[in-house]
């Protein structure tokens, strides 16, 4: 989830998207205040801009020679902003002081996914989520016994309020999918129902909104400086349903609900230099501080188990954590990586514009912290997981715009972003985790091609 919040989509004005976002050194576009703040210094007049988009999301899953497709279409409001340009003078070193504001959809988190199939057998044991339940229950019980010399009672309805108990193990025990060892009360085993046929579905929605406030300076029409203060709003929800059914029609369904809400801020600094007086070539640099997020994670889970009783009759167990603790909430702080950006731009008259950018972020440096009322110290496990599972990313952006006439332009862009995940990265739930969704997806390297046409007139 942290990687999702730290990533940013290619989004903004139609011109910015059409050129692949490679406008850091070219400037003159409202969206550049979020990449290279100095780009607003290029403006010599006021500007107002807004954009909408229609997106078609598709997810294809393949498992056990079957293919599952999930498509979703939606309209979105992508950005709105303005620039207020103030001329200082023609002969003074400081020529313009410009102010800007822009809202954009920094990250869209809409995605649906599904897959199904037989899970197979590993060694002499069927592959099942119940194995994970039993392992977590065992790890937590042994830790509590070794630390406090007390047993962990998974049958207690207050178990979901115990900071040492993992929810996956607790709901598995209360839902009848794992049992305690007859000789060792700190050891748990999955009930052996055979190889399961599993069905998985997930729905994700929400995103991150970015509000940028900018001031930029034009010095002698050769040097442009800018600073942007960004504010962020996070609203993300996820549902996942995981079902296992067996030959005798027994089985269970685990519904997991989670959401993340919060806010954050960052500071972006940028510069653009036109090194040759008689050339339009520009080179730019930008650095973004980490985004400092204050977040709240909330979750609940519901497990429904259908089984045959010893009498031969069907019975059902329903365990709903919401009945015991409502939405369990955890407050935390997240610091995303620093961002370093180098960009170049070149124009040929008023008809052709070319841009190129390179950007680096090291996701392994992300920090998780406890909230201030809990001491504000590092969350060591989560921070270590980020270091072990994530790595630095390299992003290359290329863009071009050709104006057939002053009002009409063709645009072309390309982005490449390397994966933030190491090859061996997996989702690991510690023994006291309140998460019950065990699914995860590691985003691979990404290639994005953009094509656009634009018409710009005056009112």
Indicate residue ranges for each PLM-predicted region.
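Outer-membrane beta-barrel porins/channels
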Residues: 1-11, 16, 85-459
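Outer-membrane beta-barrel translocator/receptor signature
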Residues: 14, 26-35, 41-120, 206-209
């Amino acid at each position: 989830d942290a990687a999702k919040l730290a990533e940013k989509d290619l989004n903004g004005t139609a011109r910015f998207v059409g050129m692949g976002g490679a406008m850091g050194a070219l400037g003159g576009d409202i969206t550049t205040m979020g990449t290279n703040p100095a780009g607003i210094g290029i403006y010599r007049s006021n500007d107002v801009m807004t954009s909408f988009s229609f997106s078609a999301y598709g997810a294809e899953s393949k498992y056990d020679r079957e293919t599952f497709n999930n498509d979703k279409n939606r309209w979105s409001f992508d950005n709105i902003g303005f620039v207020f340009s103030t001329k200082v003078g023609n002969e003074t070193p400081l020529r313009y002081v410009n102010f800007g504001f822009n809202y954009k959809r920094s990250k869209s988190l809409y995605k649906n996914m599904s897959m199904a199939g037989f899970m197979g057998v590993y060694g002499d044991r069927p592959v099942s989520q119940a194995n994970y339940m039993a392992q977590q229950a065992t790890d937590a019980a042994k830790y509590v016994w070794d630390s406090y010399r007390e047993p962990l009672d998974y049958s207690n309805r207050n178990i979901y309020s115990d900071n040492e108990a993992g929810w996956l193990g607790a709901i598995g025990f209360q839902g009848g999918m794992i049992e305690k060892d007859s000789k060792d009360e700190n050891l748990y085993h999955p009930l052996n129902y055979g190889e399961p046929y599993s069905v998985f579905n997930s729905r994700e929605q929400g995103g991150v909104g970015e509000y940028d406030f900018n001031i930029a300076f034009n010095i002698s029409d050769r040097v442009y400086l800018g600073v942007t203060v960004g504010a962020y709003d996070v609203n993300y929800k996820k549902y996942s349903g995981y079902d296992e059914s067996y030959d005798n029609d027994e089985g269970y369904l685990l519904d997991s609900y989670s959401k993340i809400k919060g806010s954050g801020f960052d500071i972006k600094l940028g510069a653009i230099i036109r090194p040759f007086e008689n050339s339009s070539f520009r080179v730019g640099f930008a650095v973004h501080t980490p985004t400092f997020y204050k977040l709240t994670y909330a979750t609940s889970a519901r497990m429904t188990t259908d089984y045959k009783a010893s009498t031969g009759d069907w019975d059902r167990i329903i365990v709903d954590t919401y009945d015991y603790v409502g939405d369990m909430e955890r407050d935390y702080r997240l610091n995303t990586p620093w961002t370093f950006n180098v960009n170049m731009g070149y124009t040929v008259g008023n008809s052709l514009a070319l841009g190129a950018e390179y950007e680096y972020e090291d996701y392994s440096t992300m920090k998780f912290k406890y909230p201030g009322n809990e001491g504000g110290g590092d969350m060591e496990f989560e921070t270590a997981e980020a270091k072990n599972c994530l790595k630095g990313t390299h992003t290359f952006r290329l863009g071009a715009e050709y104006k057939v006439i002053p009002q009409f332009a063709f645009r072309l862009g390309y982005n490449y972003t390397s994966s933030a995940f190491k090859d061996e990265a997996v989702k690991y739930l510690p023994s006291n985790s309140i998460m019950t969704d065990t699914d995860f997806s590691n985003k691979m390297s990404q290639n994005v091609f953009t094509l656009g046409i634009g018409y710009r007139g005056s009112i």
